[in-house]
Amino acid sequence: MAAAAVAGVAGLTTAHAKRLLREEDMTTVEFQTSEEVDVTPTFDTMGLREDLLRGIYAYGFEKPSAIQQKAIKQIIKGRDVIAQSQSGTGKTATFCVSVLQCLDIQIRETQALILAPTKELARQIQKVLLALGDYMNVQCHACIGGTNVGEDIRKLDYGQHVVAGTPGRVFDMIRRRSLRTRAIKMLVLDEADEMLNKGFKEQIYDVYRYLPPATQVCLISATLPHEILEMTNKFMTDPIRILVKRDELTLEGIKQFFVAVEREEWKFDTLCDLYDTLTITQAVIFCNTKRKVDWLTEKMREANFTVSSMHGDMPQKERESIMKEFRSGASRVLISTDVWARGLDVPQVSLIINYDLPNNRELYIHRIGRSGRYGRKGVAINFVKNDDIRILRDIEQYYSTQIDEMPMNVADLI
């Protein structure tokens, strides 16, 4: 009706008017949660199967986070959902619980497909699914590049209820007919903004074309740029929107500071001075390039500091053993690129250092959102050269937050 009215006034075709209206809708989509979203305060009242509830409590969850209270029920109902949610809010468990609830374990075919931007995140999702589904006998495979194709095919032939993976490898497996899509009921796009940043748009569309027409779609993203809204328009039917306003995206309980360093070389001395503070719990130090990670790691070790490091060029096996070491607490300081900033969950991390300020402001939330997960307290310290001040102010404004100069007693705050 609205489209016809617009068409009448402007002398446009109805189809064109509809598109204009849709574009108008898109500009406002970011700022509201759909009215029909109610809040379910406990896992017990979500109507979940008994064996899944056991898995949830065994995993250590007690009370659902805000996004879980709103989204799980809607996804289980079969609605298409757009959730704007950053890391550290329990978004992975949100769709893992929902996916597990919707499976028919008796049928050994792929019923849910989860796409993620990085191998690490896909593996993390697989781990969470297997842990939460521990009492359900769920089969779940991570389908990611850089691993043996033959092994992938063997696993898929065996029968997997859920496949989590990166778009390239998943599409490859569908094309080879190893991943059969006929029983798929649900597609989850995790960190959709990052998948688009990495140039996966074509592959996501390719995968989508192979899925049954009635497939339910859930999309999770920290930001909702235009391209994402375009995608939701194509893939989704009357989606429910569950959105966190941008100024809530800076996780509460994280104290943010900056240290002014006049020159790049001074960052290293500053870091050495802070080392004792770093090892109080566990810390992650972010650099913007792989080369910088390698350089800083070597320099720290030369100065007799114990650190471990990780970036995207390392072989999968090596990255996994480094992560395992860090998770177990055997290593306390990890130097990394942004490959780590997405979806990897180490609860003990309570200090983040941005040795380099991130290249874009969205990454800032992914990095520091890690340090106070699920309401835990955390501290973030940004090393800022003179020409970085502008970027820092931009980040402050974007997240309507305050980043103060680091006090002398920073160790007491951790």
UniProtKB/Swiss-Prot annotation:
Top-level enzyme category: hydrolase
Family stated for the protein in its record: Belongs to the DEAD box helicase family.
Ranges where the Helicase C-terminal domain occurs: 253-414
GO BP: mRNA splicing, via spliceosome; mRNA transport; nuclear-transcribed mRNA catabolic process, nonsense-mediated decay; regulation of alternative mRNA splicing, via spliceosome; regulation of translation
Record motif Q motif, residues: 41-69
UniProt subunit comment: Identified in the spliceosome C complex. Part of the mRNA splicing-dependent exon junction complex (EJC) complex; the core complex contains casc3, eif4a3, magoh and rbm8a.
Keyword Hydrolase: yes
Compartments it resides in: Nucleus; Nucleus speckle; Cytoplasm
Short motif DEAD box, span: 190-193
Function per UniProt: ATP-dependent RNA helicase. Involved in pre-mRNA splicing as component of the spliceosome. Core component of the splicing-dependent multiprotein exon junction complex (EJC) deposited at splice junctions on mRNAs. The EJC is a dynamic structure consisting of core proteins and several peripheral nuclear and cytoplasmic associated factors that join the complex only transiently either during EJC assembly or during subsequent mRNA metabolism.
Name by which UniProt lists this protein: Eukaryotic initiation factor 4A-III-B
UniProt main location, coarse: nucleus
SMART domains from the UniProt entry: DEXDc, HELICc
PANTHER family linked to this entry: ATP-DEPENDENT RNA HELICASE DBP3
